[in-house]
């Protein structure tokens, strides 16, 4: 259901909307330029968002990867349960890497900063960045863990800074639990810095256009996105469609199943029939399954529309609790992408007859090389190299090469990889 919204003419709404997206892109640029790890600075395993005072996603950075679609509002709700809006102060920064409150595994850190009016001191909204950390301790990145506790340091919702003062105890605690404290702490500070830049730019934007409350603009943007999504869903033939695939797991193959119901201007996706969780780190929390599902439908409908919460409203996603695509603690989730990346192909397979001219062929998927150890000069190493198989072909179009489908991260240049690891690529 759409929210009540102030009327904006099309030109004004377009200008204001673009400005908000440009703010997220500036946050992203700051994050990339100040980060220490190549997984952020080269591979762009990240997202940045602006949310309104009610915690609704208004704008998301242009380079955000699909697995982060829709996760920030959910994470913010958990954060505000712990630290209610009326208790927040300028300069507060809140973070968590909990897989079930964040993005599905502990290697992603979600960092949020509330934004306040400089004139009145009132809460205007929030900025949030999410990045894959180079290391979180534990067994390391991969599927080897048999419990979530093996995978590293799991942070509850906690203040990374309070009233502008960084929580040095928290940084020290993290530093002594990871293999690469310099790059890990450096990336955390980059998250703090980019959110500060984003907050400042959001205040300047609202002052420039005499906007006291972001909610009206937020409602207009999200309503427009919802209308666009509903109109495009109408192009998909009504009906109930299903698909199942058998994939390699750890000890034995496992089934992924989905049912997609298209009714006029809405879509329901259900993963009932999917196999259960396993004792290795390929289990997928629902937040990840939901993100991959939203991404799949967006690819078929309005791929060029900037991400916001409105476009997700006509789409509902469900998965039985305890199945592989709705894993619960203490199942490990470190390599949840190994299963989660099958979700778009599963959905596309179900809809191959209903939207044949829009369906994408299977992706080349993504392979990861994780390196942990010691550089020849004595420095500790914990880094990831993406091997990208490319995107599947579309109707009348070849697939894109060297992209880690279904994602939009970038491979680290060989020269940089050799420099940071001391290894040679032949």
Model-derived features with residue positions:
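Glycine/proline-enriched, intrinsically flexible loops and inter-domain linkers
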Residues: 2-90, 95-119, 123-268, 272-426
């Amino acid at each position: 259901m759409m929210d009540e919204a102030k009327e904006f003419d099309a030109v004004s709404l377009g200008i204001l909307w673009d400005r908000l997206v440009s703010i997220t892109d500036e946050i992203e640029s700051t994050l990339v330029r100040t980060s220490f790890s190549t997984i952020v600075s080269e591979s762009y395993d990240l997202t940045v968002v602006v949310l309104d005072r009610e915690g609704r996603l208004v704008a998301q950075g242009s380079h955000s990867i699909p697995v982060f679609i829709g996760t920030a509002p959910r994470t913010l709700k958990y954060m505000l349960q712990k630290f209610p809006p009326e208790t927040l102060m300028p300069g507060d920064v809140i973070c968590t890497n909990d897989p079930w409150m964040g993005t599905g595994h502990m290697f992603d850190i979600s960092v949020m900063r509330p934004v306040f009016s400089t004139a009145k001191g009132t809460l205007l909204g929030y900025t949030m960045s999410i990045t894959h950390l180079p290391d979180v301790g534990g067994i390391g990145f991969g599927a080897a863990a048999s419990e979530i506790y093996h995978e590293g340091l799991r942070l509850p919702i906690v203040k990374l800074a309070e009233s502008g003062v960084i929580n040095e105890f928290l940084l020290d605690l993290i530093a002594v639990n990871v293999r690469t404290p310099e790059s890990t702490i450096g990336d955390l500070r980059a998250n703090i810095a980019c959110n500060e830049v984003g907050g400042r730019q959001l205040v300047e934007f609202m002052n420039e256009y005499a906007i006291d409350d972001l909610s009206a603009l937020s409602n207009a943007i999200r309503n427009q996105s919802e209308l666009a999504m509903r109109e495009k869903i109408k192009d998909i033939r009504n009906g109930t469609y299903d698909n199942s695939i058998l994939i390699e797991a750890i000890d034995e193959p496992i089934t992924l199943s989905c049912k997609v119901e298209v009714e006029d201007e809405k879509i329901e996706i259900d993963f009932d029939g999917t196999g259960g969780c396993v004792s290795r780190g390929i289990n997928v929390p629902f937040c990840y399954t939901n993100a991959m599902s939203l991404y799949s439908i967006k690819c078929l409908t309005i791929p060029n529309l900037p991400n916001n919460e409105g476009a997700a409203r006509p789409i509902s996603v469900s998965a039985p609790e305890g199945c592989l695509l709705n894993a619960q603690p203490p199942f490990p989730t470190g390599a949840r992408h190994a299963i989660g990346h099958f979700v778009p192909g599963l959905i596309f397979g179900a809809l191959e007859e209903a939207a044949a001219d829009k369906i994408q062929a299977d992706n080349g998927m993504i392979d990861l090389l994780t390196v942990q150890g010691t550089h020849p000069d004595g420095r500790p190493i914990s880094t990831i190299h993406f091997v990208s198989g490319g995107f599947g072909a579309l109707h009348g179009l070849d697939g894109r090469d060297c992209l880690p489908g279904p994602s939009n991260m970038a491979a680290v240049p060989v020269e940089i990889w050799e420099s940071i690891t001391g290894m040679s690529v032949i």
